Amino acid sequence: MRTVRTLLIDNYDSFTYNLFQMLAEVNGAAPLVVRNDDTRTWQALAPGDFDNVVVSPGPGHPATDTDLGLSRRVITEWDLPLLGVCLGHQALCLLAGAAVVHAPEPFHGRTSDIRHDGQGLFANIPSPLTVVRYHSLTVRQLPADLRATAHTADGQLMAVAHRHLPRFGVQFHPESISSEHGHRMLANFRDLSLRAAGHRPPHTERIPAPAPAPAPAPAPAPPASAPVGEYRLHVREVACVPDADAAFTALFADAPARFWLDSSRVEPGLARFTFLGAPAGPLGEQITYDVADRAVRVKDGSGGETRRPGTLFDHLEHELAARALPATGLPFEFNLGYVGYLGYETKADSGGEDAHRGELPDGAFMFADRMLALDHEQGRAWLLALSSTRRPATAPAAERWLTDAARTLATTAPRPPFTLLPDDQLPALDVHYRHSLPRYRELVEECRRLITDGETYEVCLTNMLRVPGRIDPLTAYRALRTVSPAPYAAYLQFPGATVLSSSPERFLRIGADGWAESKPIKGTRPRGAGPAQDAAVKASLAAAEKDRSENLMIVDLVRNDLGQVCDIGSVHVPGLFEVETYATVHQLVSTVRGRLAADVSRPRAVRAAFPGGSMTGAPKVRTMQFIDRLEKGPRGVYSGALGYFALSGAADLSIVIRTIVATEEAATIGVGGAVVALSDPDDEVREMLLKAQTTLAALRQAHAGATASDRELLAGSLR
């Protein structure tokens, strides 16, 4: 069959690239995506360039010019076959003379069974059909030229077709991971478009289906003829596996910056390795980034500092390409490289706005040239150091460090487990909330109003807690990893600030082989008092419609983000709505994977997905604007990403949640939750406080000034 050329108008939605991927599979060619305000590209296009048009979903109302943009022109000026999805469907109907009004209830990330007429888009598709809906508005009073082709059981209009032209609209989202027969529907649209143009559609009844869920292959060993770069990796396996806590202090206590990427909760397939290191050798660097300045500052091992214009993403992309070093045959892919964080305000470089100024750098990384790696599964440990062929003295320096570090580890005694003090020995915390609890509740209500008006589907709202006074960060981290062990825990120490994280959520892992994986979390419940109650809580979470809708919205958003940078047909969801259990909570987790296109760098892939959708909501761009307005301040490190970019081409970053950021003046904590149409404001306040428990408990172990128990503190905060 010949390929079909589709123009896909993007109404700034976070699901457009799910349509992109499906259309590319069905059509045999990737569609051209044009944003609804990209008039320059639009002016260079003509109807003859395409076989059909798809108008994407999006936030807002189709009568609002800025919400619809070029979608209005393509609907009114072009006579090509057209499919409108959600907002596109509403626009098609409105411009034909229908009314668009509030639906009986907002319906986002939830499924419905619809009945259809079996014709046109619905040919050879069973009825009833299960579909996912994301809408607060609905179409009423269809004009004579449009006919209804699908409804829900309660009579809500779900699809239309023009009586004389190949024009169709669907209120639901055929591209959602939980909608049935989406590929068949788009294939039907392809065939209808070809017929309209006088072409014979394909005879085969076989419809391209989503790619199977292939297991990521192990990274291939580099060939003997692999190009030789500037850097050399020096590796030495140590005879004994040291205690991570003791080794961190013994090897890196004097480093100006240091990291502990800590699998404090070892999970097969999730967390096997712990990495401890620093920019402690002659090749080490410290990097800070300020969005407003749009420049990276690099401080080298000798203390010299340079300013390099451009974004942090640009800097990482350039330097990783220049410093590439193939994987070494070790069981892990982190063969040294960049370790640090991307603060939430870095969103200004990935589609968001530069709305707020924080006290700390918007991004901070260290180029680590010294490291200890621990394999918790095999019980092995390695020391790693870098040298440069351009600086011959760095090779013997690396070997000396390996020898000295191995000798140090051989005589380092394990540190005793951290002992948590009882409540009656702890002073009380002076917790300052950016938004009081009544005000936070009002913000939840405002989010629900925005959802009702169709401006957004889900808002991940945040509150910031500040505890004045200085703490010992390492003591607080030891308490945190004891209270709340997590697979993506981390301790990052930079001059002026230390990040202590017990994150359970993977933002994005990219293997050296190019396979990417994200594991968004949406849905949280406190653990039950006993085994029976705990099992009941877990089962309740797994079945809860509100939590599943939150999770599904973010899964579809992450699929969209990966769909921008991954091979056609490679994005898939091997795990949907799985409950993971932690020390204090159960959480609803899904897994999304895809294979990066060959020309996509790791920083570019991270940039496409940043900030993580589980910390913004959807649609991402519009919702971030509302977050800027509602929260009235920076999030800082919180809700950004933390982890490493390896010289091997691998990267692994967590979502910054369950995290303390400590400075000389105070410790700050970010907490919040996803607000959807089904949210109860009081429940959202309780969830926010629940998520603060572990970090506040750790602060109480390290901070001078606490008295009340965590339960009393939380109860008092609710009053």
UniProtKB/Swiss-Prot annotation:
Record field: compositional bias (Pro residues): 209-224
The EC number(s) this enzyme carries: 2.6.1.85
GO MF term set: 4-amino-4-deoxychorismate synthase activity
Keyword Transferase among UniProt keywords: yes
CDD domains: GATase1_Anthranilate_Synthase
PROSITE patterns, sorted: GATASE_TYPE_1
Pathway: Antibiotic biosynthesis
Active site positions: C86, H173, E175
Protein name: Aminodeoxychorismate synthase
Organism for this UniProt entry: Streptomyces pristinaespiralis
Name of the gene this protein is made from: papA
